[in-house]
Amino acid sequence: MANIDAPFGLRPIGNTVGSSDFQMTEYLIPDNEATSIFQGDAVEIDDNNAGFIAVQEAVTNVDNIGVFNGCLIDSDPSTGKPKFSNFYSQTNITQGKIKAFVFDNPYQRFLIQGDSGTAAAAADIGKVADTVATHSGSTTTGISGLELDVSDLETTDGQLKAIAFTGDPQNNELAIHANYVVQFNEHAHKTQL
């Protein structure tokens, strides 16, 4: 059975310390930030704007801070009222802040779809790889297009570590677009796995 090519970014599913604690931390997005951030995108502390987050570029050695889940614009420029969204698109605010909610527990586990470059293999588990953005995030659903770069799986130097396959009978674990359980390998709050 072929897997469906329907990326969803990084979706939290639990953590390695035994609980299903899905706590988020509030960070800030700079006013008028031009880069969109979608639910499920990996984010980092912005080097150019201290104290703010930015979308994590795929294939990079910068430590992630976590995964974006949504944002609250204190005062939406078009309505003057607070607005929550599961994705961020360029907003020029006149007052208030743009607050981002981020899953930043370094021991959080996530689900992510593998890309179409290489079929999944049992030997993938325990290896690390970067993410790849072969699809854009959706402004309709707000969901990320981020995928795991399966052809990049190796023993060192990658954003994410493959922990397991999902065990979902609707997902062929040895085909392209397999769903992986992963954990951050490169994270600002811990050393590499």
How would you label these PLM feature ranges?
Residues M1-L193:
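Surface-exposed, low-hydrophobicity beta-strand/loop segments enriched in small/polar/acidic residues
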